[in-house]
């Protein structure tokens, strides 16, 4: 605690036995020795003494981490225990040290030969001494804040007492202004000469754990760090590093029954509280870890222990690569753990599931695999449908077979009323289903391609997928032709004559012309009770959920026109980086032209408007449950159906949540985030809002289903705020260090933060000393001026009030006459110019005070002027000020020989001014 303090704790180098300090008893968890490394063996000549030394004091084995400690009596609470929360959480004191073994002579003498008289004495315990010594403090104390005494084996009670003593010493030194015998505090800004007189010269070798560290301590910490992680990776070779970090968090930060955290051993504590371990060494240190490292190394900024401001030291972390700007990256364990348990909580028990199709492969039940979906290649082809006036089951089967021959990964559309679906293998892409229902004379169940969960509807009983694959049901469809598309994470713009967009994966769009109806349509993503609907069976839409891509659309040219069609005709589109342009041909009401040409934002020109056009529109979808609106328009008096669809996609957080999309034509807008309301079943033309349910994120962005959870949304916002604040703080720190480097260093090479701060402190000290010198000089000059003024005033007061009588001459000259007179006299004798400067203020006062209106008035004012302005107490300060002005404007003090020339120039300028006026 004084100038230089070294604490020595002799112990066994090879055993993990109990280490004992000579003075205080210590808990085991404060041991920071590198016991994982074997110590160097003693010389061969001293092997016997070393074995005797080890056998003299057998040590008990170290208690395991899970062994229970025996109950003991609590210690007495002292006055300083308010500084910690739990002063009694410590291990029992250990047994005393065997001093007989310590004092045993272990020095061995070696001779070089029989004839040589040279010999060498080596202490066998010399290597042990270096392992047991730990540097506690070097130099003098600077701050009285709490000190953990890292490296010293102290109990909580001793740490509290030492910190109280340090605080009391600081109080005595700085508040009571008296020296204390315990420890002495110094501050770099004191400017005292004896700051560094007792400090040992130490080279700055690294930053992070200590400001100034000896190279031996750095090497020792590095060896402990490497040994610890080698052992950890040997135990967890087959596990990912994210689960390893999670296990460490659970091991280090969980609380026991009494609520107090378990002390962390020093071998593991160095991982938690140092920046040096992760960022202060080069990449070659991680060469042994690269084979077991599937992801980036955990960022030390995310370790909660480093959040304490007292534990952070300036390091090189701001210069390391930072992945915080990639907001879409989630914690690594979510990729491997959360996707395994999502569907278990969503799916009902197997008893409630209907029987699957025997022809379906087993992989069809797994909707979303645990890993990211690979891209599926879809051919650039065209699927045409028959143009017959009516659609029967046979034609529906033909459409299904046509779609099946294109790609096995696309779920075919089912148009049959009661025919079982034709299942195809789909091991990769999740399939979303839509069911179009319209009133008819009889109820008809519509089978879906993915029977998972039964719907609670009383009359219509199509099987229902999970929460994020609910069938989208339409209570009724108007005469217009709505085409609903499911997009992933982009904005599709619409056009009356052409619609273009690009995808990374296929997207199946099936358009139908249902029977005319006047009831509004509603779309829900959760099963809702439907009223009994009658009518012929309507086909349902089946489409594939693609990956999030950026889609480019055509410009808004004119509102799409939707003309009611007399007969239902299905149109199936298979898209992969293709352009879709509906065109009108003779004899065929609908055609779809597909090209694989490069897409332009302007779109592709097409022919005139066909009887039925395809309208594709979506809104910008946010990360958390974005909403896509599809608005259709009709040129007739029929109502405009409004449908809303949740899109389980993930885009950047900068997009506006719930953006509305409205087409030209003045159709009513539906808010993107509307509450659940009842849908009117009457035939009135009114848009019906849809019910919404949580939709999951895409599989490649951790299908955790937490996008609509308010807690997760709030946590995400808080995380973004913290990231922004942390980046701003680091940027300010970096800018501050750059400014300091520009101020204190002339060279452009990068210096460490510790050196920068040290030089900055020295620079500030120098500036403060210079400022103090300047302030002292200014104060001295002000005092000298005041002293001179006081002396002059005292001398003037000693002079008599009256002097030599002067004949009063009448001053009736004007200013120009006065200047002319001064000029003429000065040219004769330059000394008159000095006299003119003295009498000029007197002449000005005479002109302003003496009146010549009458003789009596002139006599009275002249006498008054004499009394006020011509007395010696008034003339003396006036003459003094004139002489001061003469001294400051001329060189009478520095070079009196130039005064005649300056007087001539002054009167010449004065004559010019009077002539100009």
UniProtKB/Swiss-Prot annotation:
Disordered: annotated span: 1-72, 347-402, 632-711, 897-917
Location of region: Transactivation domain: 322-445
Classification via InterPro entries: bHLH_dom, HLH_DNA-bd_sf, Max-like/E-box_TFs
Positions of the UniProt region annotated as Required for cytoplasmic localization: 73-327
Subcellular location(s) per record: Cytoplasm; Nucleus; Mitochondrion outer membrane
Pfam families named among the record's database cross-references: HLH
Biased composition annotated in UniProt, kind: Acidic residues: 27-37
Any one Gene Ontology molecular-function term assigned to this protein's record: protein dimerization activity
Domain bHLH: 717-767
Residues found modified as Phosphoserine: 9, 33, 39, 667
Biased composition (Polar residues): 378-388, 670-685
Region ranges (Leucine-zipper): 767-788
Protein's name according to its UniProt entry: MLX-interacting protein
Species this chain originates from: Mus musculus
Protein encoded by which gene: Mlxip
